[in-house]
UniProtKB/Swiss-Prot annotation:
Entry GO terms, CC: cytosolic large ribosomal subunit
Record has Repeat as a keyword: no
Quaternary structure, from the entry: Part of the 50S ribosomal subunit. Forms a bridge to the 30S subunit in the 70S ribosome.
Ranges for region Disordered: 198-238
Domain of life: Archaea
PANTHER family from the UniProt entry: LARGE RIBOSOMAL SUBUNIT PROTEIN UL2, RIBOSOMAL PROTEIN L2
Molecular function terms, GO-annotated: rRNA binding; structural constituent of ribosome
Species of provenance: Sulfolobus acidocaldarius (strain ATCC 33909 / DSM 639 / JCM 8929 / NBRC 15157 / NCIMB 11770)
Name of the featured protein: Large ribosomal subunit protein uL2
InterPro entries: NA-bd_OB-fold, Rib_uL2_dom2, Ribosomal_uL2, Ribosomal_uL2_arc_euk, Ribosomal_uL2_C, Ribosomal_uL2_dom3, Ribosomal_uL2_RNA-bd_dom, Translation_prot_SH3-like_sf
NCBIfam families assigned to the protein according to its UniProt record, in alphabetical order: PRK09612.1
Gene3D superfamilies: 2.30.30.30, Nucleic acid-binding proteins, Ribosomal protein L2, domain 3
Described function: One of the primary rRNA binding proteins. Required for association of the 30S and 50S subunits to form the 70S ribosome, for tRNA binding and peptide bond formation. It has been suggested to have peptidyltransferase activity; this is somewhat controversial. Makes several contacts with the 16S rRNA in the 70S ribosome.
Length: 238
């Protein structure tokens, strides 16, 4: 009897394929509050499974929350949040109050959603223009998106941008990297498996040895390879 494919095991939702969210510090979102407030950064924490560190902020009304850390902030630093907050590194301001060219991060699409854009380590967005009650922001991918003028954003660049420059050096470090995410690692090639484990497995060779294209309506145990592809291989030159 054949074995289940990796995607079939993932579809069942076993422990190896579920993100260990219980290890996270907590949701890194803006609080749903109105008006202007002052706050202080009381801690900077590593958030397992997330590229960027988070800061713990305590407001003047006693409310505490987490947001992605910005480059240059420090424990004890005071920040402002609200429509009339100053344009300073780490402050949370409505994007409609920011001039063009301002570098921002953790940008909301609609006020109250907690932050949708530019949340990964080292990412940022730039105010590129305004159109009516919408603000145009340019993401790191060069894509232009529209957000509400009442949406909030943090002034600055998300911290931790150089984490990709540190070499992993050994497979063990890569194991722990994926251990805190919803990723099964390592991923073995189908041609390297036994015939019982994969449709591409078996034989003393590293080739599929059969057409790798499969129908869109193929059963789950056979639906691997080039699924419903129009063509495979290199495109011939004219």
């Amino acid at each position: 009897m054949g074995k289940k494919l990796l995607q079939q095991r993932a579809g069942r939702g076993g422990i190896n394929f579920r993100s260990p969210s219980w290890r996270r510090v907590g949701p890194a979102r803006y609080p749903n509050i109105e008006g202007d407030h002052k706050g202080k950064i009381i801690d900077i924490l590593h958030n397992p499974g997330v590229t960027a560190p988070v800061v713990k902020v305590k407001l003047d009304n006693g409310l505490q929350f987490y947001i992605p850390a910005v480059q240059g902030v420090a424990v004890g630093q005071e920040i402002s949040i609200g429509k009339n907050a100053t344009i300073s590194n780490g402050n949370i301001v409505e994007v409609g109050q920011l001039p063009e060219g301002t570098v921002i991060c953790n940008v909301e699409k609609l006020k109250g959603d907690g932050g949708k854009f530019a949340r990964a380590a080292g990412s940022y967005a730039v105010i590129s223009g305004k159109a009516g009650n919408k603000v145009l922001i340019k993401l790191s991918s060069e894509k232009i998106v529209e957000v509400s003028q009442n949406a909030r954003a943090t002034v600055g660049i998300i911290a931790g941008g150089g984490f990709v420059e540190k070499p992993l050096l050994k497979a063990g470090n890569n194991y722990w990297k994926y251990r805190v995410r919803a990723v099964k690692w390592p991923v073995v090639r189908g041609v390297a498996m036994n015939a019982v484990s994969h449709p591409h497995g078996g034989g003393l060779h590293q080739s599929v040895s059969r057409p790798s294209t499969v129908s869109r309506n193929a059963p789950p145990g056979r639906k691997v390879g080039h699924i419903a592809s129009r063509r495979t291989g290199r495109r011939g030159g004219a």
